[in-house]
Every structure is written in C-alpha cells, then in structure tokens.
Curated annotation (Swiss-Prot):
Pfam families given in the database record: Amidase
Designated name of the protein: Glutamyl-tRNA(Gln) amidotransferase subunit A
Gene: gatA
GO cellular component assignments: glutamyl-tRNA(Gln) amidotransferase complex
Keyword Nucleotide-binding: yes
Length: 481
C-alpha cells in the first residue's frame, strides 16, 4: 500500500485498526518531500512532527483516545497562519526570524483534537499574488508540469497536496488564493463562508475578505476538518456558526437542482481550453437532471475593480505594522525614525507588496477617497451583495470556471499587472459576497495542465455546498483518491 496516497479518513481508519502507525505514514509523506524538494512547496518540514506521531502511536497502543477525533490526521499549514513556537514569515524577508508566540484559533482547535501539523508552506509574500512566484523563498513549481506556475497565493499548500507530500493543507483565500492553485494543480480547494472559520492568528491582508481555506483530494476530509474548526470565536468578532444538518454528507440525486450561470462571464472571454471544458461541464450537469439558467448581472463588470480598490486599501493599513520595531528582521544603521521606516520597508518588502501598499495609500488620499474607495464600498454593499442575495432566492448554486485562464509559464514578465489580476475575476465573487466556494478538478489540456470548475453556494450554507459537490464528483466520475 502506498502510504503517501491516502485521505485523512483512510489514515485514521488504518491507525485505529492498528494496520499502520501514524509515524510510518508521516515518514512516507516526508520521504516524498525529500525526493521532490525542488517543487518548493514547503518552507519548513517540522521534524518534531515525527516525535508527536510517535507519542500518538503510544496513545493508540494504550487506548487513550478520549477527545481526539482527529488523531493521526496530518496537515500542512500556510506560512501566514500562526503556530506557537514556529517561524511565521508570510514568505517575506521583513519577518525573517519572527517566531509566533501563540496558536491561531484554527490551529488550536486542530491540535486539541489530535491533528499533527507537519510543516509550513510557501506562498506569495503577504498573500499578494496569483502565481506563487512572489516569495522570499523562491517560486513554487506546479507538480503537474514544472514549467508552469501553480497559482497563488497559497501555491505551496496546493503543491504539497498535489505532490502527495501532505494529505491535507490549510491556505488562505482573499480573492481566490485557495481555489486558483487548486484548479491549476488538479485538487480540491475550498473557501468557507466569511467568518465561518476564525481569522484570529491569520496574518491580515484584506480583513473584509480574508478566510482560511482547505486543500485536499477528498471532499469528506474537507467536511470533517470544517466540522472541527468552524464556529464562532471570542477572539474574532466577525466569526459565525455555520454547522448544519447537511453533515455528515449524504449521497443524493442531482435531479432538480437549480444552477445559475452569469451571462457577463462569457465563454468568449475565456481561454479556448477553459471555454470548452466549461461548456462540457454544463452539458454533464444537464445530463444528470440539473436545471441551468443564464442570468444577467451587469454589476459583474465592477467586481474586479472593486476588489482591487478595497483590498489594497485594507492592505496598506494592515501592513503598516511592519516597521522593523516589533517584528522580524531589522536594519542596524543609526537613522532618524522616518528614515529607518523608509529604508526598512524599502529593503525588505517585495515590489508586488510595495505596489499594493502604494496603491492603497493613493486610494485613501483625501483627493481620491470618495472617488474610488468610498464608491467601491457603496456599490458592493448596495448593488452587488443584494443582487447576489436575490439570485440565490431562485437558484441553489452558481457555477463558473475557477479561472478564465490556464496556468502561466514560470517567469512570465507581467509588464501590465492587470493581466495577472484578471485571473481572479471568477473567484473574487465569493469573497466579495462572503459566500462559500469550491474548485473541483474537472479536466486537463494537451499539456497536462489542470482546469477546475467553481461552485459558489449560499452564505453560511457551507455543508450544503460540500454535500452538493460530493454528489457532483460522484455522478460525474471526477478524479479523486
């Protein structure tokens, strides 16, 4: 049996029936990592995870299983989620050497229930990017074709699951940062409803949109981990309860479900391979008795602009804390305070991060605040969110391709950053309206590159979305393990 090709639920079944030790399974994943380090999915593999695995094996031997429903479950973690006594750098030189003094709420809930954290994964610096090339630690490669990007910003978390270096991983999703790399690497990527998982301990990029998400080969694993990590948290006032009676996920017919396709997201705008796959996806769903209607949402044309106005504004505020006085790496020259701030941030932040900070400050300036930022917030709250709420009164889910484009070639020089930002046009919808969304691996092109399909559900109906996705995977025969 290949011990590095298992779901979390299968791992637990094997260890609870004493057919395998947690240590041996973890060692198989670590060996895969050692053999394929060039993918650069991990920033650090935790050596102490092997000792924790041994300790849990002893617990199993002595039948000490009380309150450990996730025992034996191995999880990699994106480098912007706090783990006590572990390095946290957000893949930035400016945080080099910083050790987190506390656990994020999601991490604490996983640890308390027996999960083992096995490493921290690469990412675009401060979660700003769509390729996972903007990292202090170098680019993460796509395991399906190493000449192409894996997508970002949670590219490392996607890569370690796709390359069977971890059975499950945590990422963060602000505008598609879980779903895009999941689509590009041929695995499942799930973003919960806004507030469904506590953001306490997640390094902030754009607080209105940030959400911890999951990568896996198994929809059941996603539902299980969501069950044990979701819910309100006194440390995060935006957190909410989302658990409902759709768990455990049930096998049900797709017959009679109502799906919406947004007219303005035209197939004419998509890469040819993506357009063909999306057309086939719709035909496959229709053949299962699903109703699909095309709806017009003219405000969709504002979606990307609104996201790239609000997110850099919030980023410019959130990243103001990285001055060199409290966190991470410091320069040692004797400078005035303002010169110290300027030199520190100029030296240790990447060009992409500086670009978004400058844009955010520009949009907040007295001259432009009401023209851009205030207007974007007004359109989002008064037009876009109500329009989608109205749409969900007559449909169960919205379907789109996860991305209009295929993976980019590594090292592609984006002289116009908007070309890269355009890859987020389908995924930002769920973040702006606070809805859950998932990317399903659907097809591959002639170069072996994966094309994913996105399903968006109703806000706070995460398990309903996962249940429907399970049945889509089952009835369409989509690949998984």
């Amino acid at each position: 049996m290949d011990l590095s090709n298992l779901t979390l639920t299968k791992i637990q079944e094997l260890v609870l029936t004493r057919k395998c030790k947690i240590y041996d399974i973890l060692l198989a994943y670590k060996n895969n990592y050692e053999l394929n380090k060039d993918i650069n999915g991990y920033i650090e593999f935790f050596d102490d995870s092997l000792e924790i695995a041994k300790r849990y094996d002893d617990c199993l031997k002595n039948c000490e299983l009380e309150d450990l429903p996730l025992i034996g479950m191995l999880i990699a973690v994106k480098d912007n989620i706090s783990i006590q006594d572990k390095s946290l750098t957000c893949a930035s030189e400016i945080l080099k050497g910083y050790i987190s003094p506390y656990d994020a709420t999601v991490i604490k809930r996983l640890k308390n229930k027996g999960a083992i954290l096995i490493g921290r994964t690469n990412m675009d610096e401060f979660a700003m990017g769509s390729t996972c090339e903007f990292s202090y630690y170098g680019a993460t490669l796509n395991p399906l074709n190493r000449e192409y990007v894996i997508g970002g910003s949670s590219g490392g978390s996607a890569a370690v699951v796709a390359a069977f270096q971890a059975p499950f991983s945590l990422g963060s999703d602000t505008g598609g940062s879980v779903r895009l790399p999941a689509s590009f690497s041929g695995i499942l990527g799930f973003k919960p409803s806004y507030g469904g998982l506590s953001r306490y301990g997640l390094a902030s990029y754009a607080s209105s949109f940030d959400q911890i998400g999951f990568f896996s080969h198994s929809i059941e694993d996603i539902a299980l981990i969501l069950k044990h990590t979701c819910g309100s948290d006194k440390m995060d006032s935006t957190s909410v309860d989302i658990f409902d009676d759709f768990y455990p996920l049930k096998i049900e017919s797709l017959q009679g479900k109502n799906l919406a396709v947004i007219k303005e997201l035209s197939e004419d705008l998509m890469d040819k391979n993506v357009a063909n796959s999306f057309a086939k996806f719709k035909l496959d769903l229709l053949s299962k008795g699903i109703n699909i209607k095309e709806v017009s949402i003219e405000e969709i044309n504002f979606i990307l602009s609104i996201y790239y106005i609000i997110s850099p504004v919030e980023a410019s505020s959130n990243l103001a804390r990285y001055t060199g006085l409290c966190y991470g790496k410091r320069i040692s020259e004797g400078l005035s305070l303002n010169d110290f701030y300027f030199k520190h941030r100029s030296n240790f932040l990447s060009e992409e991060v500086k670009r978004r900070i400058v844009l955010g400050n520009y949009l907040l300036s007295e001259r432009y605040d009401s023209k851009y930022y205030a207007k974007a917030c007004e359109i989002l709250q008064n037009l876009i969110i109500p329009k989608f709420n109205k749409l969900f009164e007559s449909c169960d889910f919205i379907i789109t391709p996860t991305s209009f484009v295929k993976p980019f070639r590594l090292g592609l020089d984006f002289d116009d950053p908007v070309k890269m930002y355009y890859s987020d046009i389908c995924t930002v919808i769920a973040n702006l309206i606070g809805a859950p969304a998932i990317s399903l691996p659907y097809s591959k092109d002639e170069e072996g590159l994966s094309i994913g399909m996105q399903i968006i559900g109703r806000s706070k109906k995460d398990f309903e979305l996962l249940s429907f996705s399970k049945n889509v995977i089952r009835e369409l025969g989509l690949n998984g393990i």
